Amino acid sequence: MKIIFVCSGNTCRSPLAESIAKSLLPHDSIASRGLFAVEGQAISKESLELIHKYDLPEPSRAQAFHIDDLDADIILTMTQAHKDLIFSMYGRQSNVFTLNEYVGDTQEIDDPFGGSFDVYEQTYTKIYDLVDKIKFKHE
């Protein structure tokens, strides 16, 4: 199954989700994108520190969301606003969900950009908990 995680810049939330998912869902094809990503930009220092702290696979550098990405089996956005933007750009898509919506949770993933390391760690924990639920949804 091909899963793409989407946030704004593809430097904080979606790369964390990509790394966590690569660890928890090793048989799936995992990627991340940003709706406003600068192609090739490095992920945030704090996100990279968390990836190393938890010994996760490193994500790819920032990549923008493109129409070809709609071919993924599942596209999981960090917020309703990201989902709405994809719909406004490409029309309604049956494979696009917010991450929390997909696993039956209510918490959106706020952007930690500019926050302290603790804020990034809280974001990591939220994303980990939600991505972990994907495992059970696919069993």
From Swiss-Prot:
SUPFAM superfamilies: Phosphotyrosine protein phosphatases I (SSF52788). It comes from the Bacteria. The keyword Hydrolase applies. Disulfide bonds: none annotated. The active site is at C7, R13, D111. Belongs to the low molecular weight phosphotyrosine protein phosphatase family. This is Low molecular weight protein-tyrosine-phosphatase PtpB. It comes from Staphylococcus epidermidis (strain ATCC 35984 / DSM 28319 / BCRC 17069 / CCUG 31568 / BM 3577 / RP62A).
